[in-house]
Amino acid sequence: MCGIAGTLAVDPNATPDGEAVQRMCDAMVHRGPDDHGYLTDGPCALGHRRLSIIDLRPEGAQPMTNEDGSIAVIVNGEIYNFQELRRDLQAKGHTFRSLSDSEVIVHLYEEEGVDFLDHLRGMFALALWDGPRRRLVLARDRFGKKPLFYHADSRGLVFASELGALAESGRFERRPDIDAIDAFLSLQYVPSPWTAFEGVRKLPAGCRLVCEAGRIGEPERYFQLRFDQPTTGSLTELTERLHAQVEDAVRVRMVSDVPLGAFLSGGLDSSLIVAMMAMQSSQPVKTFSVGFTSKDFSELPYAKMVSDRYGTDHHEIVVEPDMAAVIPEFVRHYGEPFADSSALPTWYLCQYTRTGVTVALSGDGADEAFAGYRRYSHSRTARALRQLPGPLPTALAKALGSIPIPAAQQVRDYGRRLMEPEHVRFLGLAAHIPHEDRVALYGPAMRQRFAEDLVARRFGELYAASTASDPVNRLLDLDIQTYLTDDILTKVDIASMAHSLEVRCPLVDQELMAFAASVPGEMKLRGLTTKLILREVAKPLLPEKILTRRKQGFGLPVDRWMRDDLAPLSRDVLLDQTARERGIFDPAAIETLLLQHQRGEPRGDQIWALMMLELWYRAFIDR
């Protein structure tokens, strides 16, 4: 795990801006506190901050080059099949100077050209410079576990692992991308390829960008998860195959030259990972859990249950979140607005885990691969209700949408969306500030600009292009391309790298995900049971209470905070003169929103998102 940055000039005779590369790397010391390295060749300059994981010797430093130094690469991430690739490349005559996983990339490129990406199993964002061809290749792993941001203009290209670092390049004016702001308010994250800065883009997951002969290329997809290659077999047979897939995904992620452990929340997913690790380790697995003084949001007893079963070297801590201290750090590290409240416990968990290990395995990705969220079952119910005869669906939608009880807001929203297209209804279930609520909050100019829901249009395009015919898998495909990459994996990357911790996600292994995509939806979601086939894998491995407990999630009591502890701060942030003068929101509408929340309507998530947006403006736009 590391931080990478670089620049490429369009003019082949230009001198690259090495100082900009150094500034960007200096802004990412937390991603790589162990070492740094730079390379300049013609119009290209590359920079790297190193967090040493594999081959801790100086020979493992980056940039890595081939035998004659003509090809160089900087990598943020891990290549899990590097030993197999190394043997194959050595058999073809390639010479290696290190034991690093990253070095295989330059030699693989010599053999395969830009198609080298097809052979990598791992998590990565990388930049490869081919000096003789004057070719720069940027690439991101299949599911976007590692981030990569870039800005292109008439002078050339500049890129970095973090938005905040890219902003230090001085190559673009810090203007907000208003379309991205609207998308953030809908989703609580900025979806790819947008970023919160105008003219800056995320390289989408599974894409590469090739620059050659003075031309800055466009992102091109080298990987697309396929849902149109269904597998056959009974639940028992597919469970056995999935068990082997999870076991292998865990095995390849336990290779490390530094201390390694695991997150253990006590939920199904992290517990399964710990069980698999324990069965493959000769030493007790180091496990880490974080709890909160609010018992409603603490899972420590469940984590202890799994720890006791497998005899792990367990570490747990109970914290009282210090919001005043943490929020500014959040805003700075994320580089753009991000309002998933589970980012806070993830932050504390990573901070605590880093005191004991340098690498941790997590259970992220299972919900998106195997249908773990309620919105999948809600969508299935809506499909069934819409198939009722005659006018019944419309009448039911009207009845549910007009329930007068204030506490029944979710039921009313469900009723109002019952007759909408599938992707619009699904977005409504996932959205934190639905389109009609955003429009009501906006000032006149914003209200006019977003009369159409651009986020719904984007979701519609992805939904229509899905290769899945199964309705459950079609929604999983949508979540994998949006929520998994731009919320879950972003949250884990930022929280972990802020504390120089590498996190590996076995359940987002590319081979496991391909198998999951081939499994019928009915083996994932059956009745009220979510993640059915994964639960079958876990049955013989975990206590019954872990298997049957209700999904709790990793969020925090935002509604209560925004009504009590953070109420004064939210008013100060959202209603002061600075916020009013931006012209984004109608101050009267913000006043009404805050009042509604104080009166008992659950608007905490919306207020939290508005706060994160305003604080981002102050940190990155107003400076």
Regions found by a protein language model. Name each.
Residues 105, 349, 405-415:
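Glycine-rich phosphate-binding/catalytic subdomain of phosphoryl-transfer
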Residues 166, 289-290, 336, 380-388:
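Short beta-alpha connecting loops at secondary-structure transitions
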Residues 1-334, 346, 350, 539-540, ...:
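Cysteine-centered catalytic environments shared across enzyme families
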Residues 38, 147-150, 272-275, 369, ...:
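Generic hydrophobic alpha-helical membrane-span motif
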Residues 93-96, 336, 595-600:
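A short glycine/serine-rich beta->alpha loop
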Residues 1-4, 23, 42, 168, ...:
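Adenosyl-5′-phosphate
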Residues 329-333, 354, 376-378, 561-563:
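Short low-complexity, flexible loop/linker segments enriched in glycine and/or proline
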